[in-house]
Amino acid sequence: MRKPLIAGNWKMNKTDGETKQFINDLKCLDISDNVEACIISPFTSLKTLTEDLRNSNISTGAQNMYYEECGAFTGEVSPNMLKDLGIDYVIIGHSERRTIFKEDDELLNKKIASALKHDIKPILCCGENLEQRESNRHEEVVESQIRLDLKGINEKDIMSKLVIAYEPIWAIGTGKTASSDDAQSMCKFIRNLLSKMYSKDLADSVRIQYGGSVKPENILDIMSKEDIDGALVGGASLEAESFSKLINYGK
């Protein structure tokens, strides 16, 4: 049984003070034990996040990391720095990292291997853009991303650690909408791909999230799908009350 993972990706939002206020507000609200909740903040708030949530049932995550442990890499954050803070998860290959910062699959592959080496669970993001979707290449694109990003990584290394987040880039800020059936179709495709790449046991153990304008109004429909095991949420995770509704979607 895969425990759903509802992760709030704050992106470049919230100061450290605002993070403290969010946590205080969230502690006053109901936090379900039926799902794993995770907050993924900017680097500047990670220390506050891990300290203030230490005795809670909420996991923590970082939005990015470099694959080297130390050195002359100005502006980067290493996996051992994240591990020292007690971070549980790290996002690898978010669509904004791929498009804005031109991160390619070779780099992402190194990041995933490094995260696993340091016992940080990677949330690997994948997804196709509008042109790729309309030319019916969405499965081809996502398969290529996953195969390249996991190249050389063994099944035993990712069992119970890897999370995959499917992001339909074509449905984010384009006026197009992805239905829950669209999401289920791609998440099922990803699970079948993992079964071919590794084994059915591995595929059945991996949690596959959906990340495309998830909000309290649509999460119940999304989470009703067989192969969707959670959500990677953006804007709807920035307010404590909204995030609490997402976590408690089944109530």
Swiss-Prot record:
It is found in: Cytoplasm. PROSITE patterns: TIM_1, TIM_2. GO terms for biological process: gluconeogenesis; glyceraldehyde-3-phosphate biosynthetic process; glycerol catabolic process; glycolytic process. Substrate binds at residues 9-11, 173, 213, 234-235. It catalyses: D-glyceraldehyde 3-phosphate = dihydroxyacetone phosphate. One of its GO terms (molecular function) is triose-phosphate isomerase activity. The keyword Isomerase applies. Pathway: Carbohydrate biosynthesis; gluconeogenesis; Carbohydrate degradation; glycolysis; D-glyceraldehyde 3-phosphate from glycerone phosphate: step 1/1. Its main location: cytoplasm. The active site is at residues 94, 167. The keyword Isomerase applies. Its EC number is 5.3.1.1. Keywords: Cytoplasm, Gluconeogenesis, Glycolysis, Isomerase. One of its GO terms (cellular component) is cytosol. Homodimer. NCBIfam families: tim. Belongs to the triosephosphate isomerase family. Involved in the gluconeogenesis. Catalyzes stereospecifically the conversion of dihydroxyacetone phosphate (DHAP) to D-glyceraldehyde-3-phosphate (G3P). This is Triosephosphate isomerase.
